């Protein structure tokens, strides 16, 4: 049974600052506060003007307590669009209430409705609570993959 006190909805254009606060909360949880360079203006432009990604917000008893930021990828093997979940975060005071599961249910509904092939994401290897949560949901770990990155300061060297 879903908790009526919890509402999952798409973020509105006026909520760039709230999204940035949640990103900072995630960064603090991951011990990466110094890595957040995004500004409210960048969040607004990339999410609501360029529409580079989408954001779901979780409200608990009328207060915003979490977010899920995702964008679309494509599988050449499946011939289908996928959802890539970049970030999922629920504030500490709202954890354990089923909000993470509701985010995934919402993403799964989007994927079903649009005929997408997968929902994929990565998780920090030390984040045991999240790993257990994902396993409990039936997610599979792809041990044969590694994530690589070229940052913007290296683009010209490629």
Where are these regions (language model features)?
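A short helix-loop-beta-strand connector motif used in the catalytic cores of GNAT acetyltransferases and
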Residues: 45-57
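A short, internal acetyl-CoA/4′-phosphopantetheine-binding micro-motif in the GNAT/acyltransferase core
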Residues: 88-95
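Conserved acetyl-CoA-binding loop-helix of GNAT-fold acetyltransferases
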Residues: 96-109, 136
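Conserved GNAT acetyl-CoA-binding A-motif
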Residues: 112-122
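Conserved beta-strand in the GNAT
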Residues: 57, 63-72
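Conserved active-site alpha-helix within GNAT-family acetyltransferase domains
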Residues: 101, 125-144, 150
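Conserved GNAT-fold acetyl-CoA-binding loop/helix
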Residues: 20-46
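A short beta-loop-alpha structural element at the N-terminal edge
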Residues: 7-19
């Amino acid at each position: 049974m879903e908790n009526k006190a919890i509402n999952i909805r798409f973020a509105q254009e006026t909520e760039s600052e709230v999204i940035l606060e949640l990103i900072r909360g995630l960064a603090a949880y991951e011990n990466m506060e110094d890595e957040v360079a995004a500004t409210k203006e960048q969040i607004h432009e990339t999410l609501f003007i360029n529409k580079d990604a989408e954001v779901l917000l979780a409200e608990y008893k009328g207060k915003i307590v979490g977010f899920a930021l995702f964008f679309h990828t494509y599988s050449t093997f499946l011939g289908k669009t996928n959802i890539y979940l970049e970030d999922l975060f629920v504030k500490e005071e709202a954890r354990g209430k089923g909000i993470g599961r509701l985010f995934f249910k919402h993403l799964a509904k989007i994927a079903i409705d649009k005929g997408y092939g997968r929902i994929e994401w990565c998780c920090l290897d030390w984040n045991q609570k999240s790993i257990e949560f994902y396993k409990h949901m039936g997610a599979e770990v792809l041990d044969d993959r590694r994530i690589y990155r070229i940052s913007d300061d290296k683009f010209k060297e490629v």
